[in-house]
C-alpha cells in the first residue's frame, strides 16, 4: 500500500514561527515542528510549503488538490480575508483541515471570522504546534 501524502500548507508570517510573538505562537520553528511530525508519522509522506503570497497558496492548492490525500492548512491572516482561498479549497477534491496554532476566539474579534471554514472538512485550533498533529490524525481517520 502506498504511503498517504499530506501537505502542510502555511500562509503569511508563519515563516517567522519561533521568532514571532512567542507568547502566542511558542518558541518552536516550523522546521523543528515539521521534523517532529515526520518522526511521528513515518508511514505518511508529509510535504511542507509556506508562502506570504495569496496567489502562491492558491496555486499550491490547485497543484496538489487532486492528487494528495489531505492538506493541513494554516492560512494565517488570510483566514479572515480571503474569499479566493475559500474558492480554491472548494474547487479541489483533496480534503482540507483548517488549523490555527492559537485559540482565535481568545484573540481580537476580527480573528473570530473565518472565510475558509465552510470549504474545509474541519477546524483545529488552540493547541499550539500540536494542532498540526491533530489535523494529520483527523485526515488519516477520514
Where on the chain are the PLM-derived regions?
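Extreme N-terminal starter segment of soluble prokaryotic enzymes
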Residues: 2-6
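Glycine- and acidic-residue-enriched helix-capping/strand-helix junction motifs
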Residues: 16-31
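Short beta->alpha junction loops
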Residues: 47-55
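Short acidic/histidine-rich motifs immediately flanking catalytic phosphotransfer sites
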Residues: 64-71
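Short acidic active-site motifs
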Residues: 56-60
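Short Gly/Thr/Asp-enriched flexible loops that form oxyanion-binding sites at enzyme active sites
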Residues: 82-91
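Short, glycine-/small-residue-rich phosphate/pyrophosphate-handling segment
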Residues: 47-48, 97, 106-142
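Short glycine-rich anion-binding loops that position phosphate/pyrophosphate groups of nucleotides
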Residues: 12-14, 76-79, 102-104
Amino acid at each position: 500500500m502506498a504511503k498517504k501524502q499530506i501537505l502542510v500548507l502555511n500562509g503569511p508570517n508563519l515563516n517567522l514561527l519561533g521568532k514571532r510573538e512567542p507568547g502566542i505562537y511558542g518558541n518552536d520553528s516550523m522546521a523543528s515542528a515539521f521534523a517532529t511530525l515526520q518522526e511521528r508519522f513515518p508511514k505518511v509522506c508529509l510535504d511542507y510549503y509556506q508562502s506570504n503570497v495569496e496567489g502562491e497558496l492558491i496555486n499550491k492548492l490547485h497543484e496538489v488538490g487532486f492528487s494528495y490525500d489531505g492538506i493541513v492548512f494554516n492560512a494565517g491572516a488570510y483566514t479572515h480575508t480571503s474569499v479566493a482561498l475559500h474558492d480554491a479549497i472548494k474547487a479541489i477534491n483533496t480534503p482540507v483541515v483548517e488549523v490555527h496554532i492559537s485559540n482565535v476566539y481568545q484573540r481580537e474579534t476580527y480573528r473570530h471570522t473565518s472565510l475558509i471554514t465552510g470549504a474545509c472538512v474541519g477546524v483545529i485550533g488552540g493547541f499550539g504546534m500540536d494542532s498540526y498533529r491533530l489535523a494529520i490524525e483527523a485526515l488519516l481517520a477520514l
